[in-house]
Amino acid sequence: MSFTSRLKKELFIKAQNLVPQHQLSRVVGKVAASENPILKAAVIHAFKTKYGIDLSIAEQGNALKYKSFNDFFTRALKDGVRLVDENPDSIVSPADGAISQIGKITAGEVFQAKGQSFSVEKLIGDPQLAQPFQEGEFATVYLSPRDYHRVHMPFSGTLTETLYVPGELFSVNQVTAENVPGLFARNERMVCLFDTELGRMAVVLVGAMIVAGIETVATGKVKPSGRIELQHHELKLEKGAELGRFYLGSTAIILFEKDKIEWEKRYKAESVVVMGERMGHTL
């Protein structure tokens, strides 16, 4: 790596700690939620152009018909665009995106990037709720700005708890994954816990800088607070059903207990996935 590239990386990481993360995200959130026709049309057009958004696969193909940027960003897809693997033993991708990391949880640690990991206990935010996942399996899926931003069930189960964990809002990308210790266990997140025929399963929705919000089917849009908030539920969700959505980012992490599933061998860091695609199978 050249001196210039290394310097840019170091400055980017330092800036993460200097920027008022939550205040910036709130400002972006207000713009994203605005239904002002001129503002929302301008923002949608700029975003669509920059990221090459393909509206031909969206349920609503006319960008002007969305009531706000948030409405556009969390757009539904046409029926049949994403097919959920119907094999009863399959574990499917919860979202469109790219695999950041995938594999085993070793000594309670989830691999983040070269030289970086974080504890499953810190990720979940509760030692007792995290216990079943020690030595289990994990997959981290990063949703880029151009991706479909709804998160779906990787396997059928009953939602029993949601746990809002307050935190920071670092940007999520390869640079921060490699240089911010415990990135995913430090950012604000919503932990969704399930009972399944395989035992316990978790889907963790992780926020990031300028993420305007996280929403789940059980809690609605999350209202950030400075404390951990645990809610109990009894909601049955089938594989492929919508679980939640991101307003501007960023990452979904799925966890299973030890010796319950196996990931397909072809998947590795940076593998591209689409929602409903078979990523693994039960044992």
Curated annotation (Swiss-Prot):
- EC numbers: 4.1.1.65
Q: In which pathway does it act?
A: Phospholipid metabolism; phosphatidylethanolamine biosynthesis; phosphatidylethanolamine from CDP-diacylglycerol: step 2/2
What's the superkingdom here?
Answer: Bacteria
Record's comment on post-translational modification: Is synthesized initially as an inactive proenzyme. Formation of the active enzyme involves a self-maturation process in which the active site pyruvoyl group is generated from an internal serine residue via an autocatalytic post-translational modification. Two non-identical subunits are generated from the proenzyme in this reaction, and the pyruvate is formed at the N-terminus of the alpha chain, which is derived from the carboxyl end of the proenzyme.
What top-level class of enzyme does the UniProt entry assign? lyase
Please give the coiled-coil regions recorded for this protein.
none
Question: Could you tell me which InterPro entries the record lists for this protein?
Answer: PS_Dcarbxylase, PSD-B, PSD_type1_pro
The protein's annotated catalytic reaction(s) are: a 1,2-diacyl-sn-glycero-3-phospho-L-serine + H(+) = a 1,2-diacyl-sn-glycero-3-phosphoethanolamine + CO2
Q: Which residues carry this modification: Pyruvic acid (Ser)?
A: S250
GO term, biological process aspect, one: phosphatidylethanolamine biosynthetic process
A GO molecular function held by the record: phosphatidylserine decarboxylase activity
Mostly located where? membrane
Q: Which residues form the active site?
A: D96 (charge relay system), H152 (charge relay system), S250 (charge relay system), S250 (schiff-base intermediate with substrate)
Q: Cite the entry's keywords alphabetically.
A: Cell membrane, Decarboxylase, Lipid biosynthesis, Lipid metabolism, Lyase, Membrane, Phospholipid biosynthesis, Phospholipid metabolism, Pyruvate, Zymogen
In the record's cofactor note, how is the cofactor described as bound? Binds 1 pyruvoyl group covalently per subunit.
Entry's HAMAP family? PS_decarb_PSD_B_type1 (MF_00662)
* Subunit annotation: Heterodimer of a large membrane-associated beta subunit and a small pyruvoyl-containing alpha subunit.
Q: What is this protein called?
A: Phosphatidylserine decarboxylase proenzyme
Species: Acinetobacter baumannii (strain ATCC 17978 / DSM 105126 / CIP 53.77 / LMG 1025 / NCDC KC755 / 5377)
From the UniProt record, report the name of the gene that encodes this protein: psd
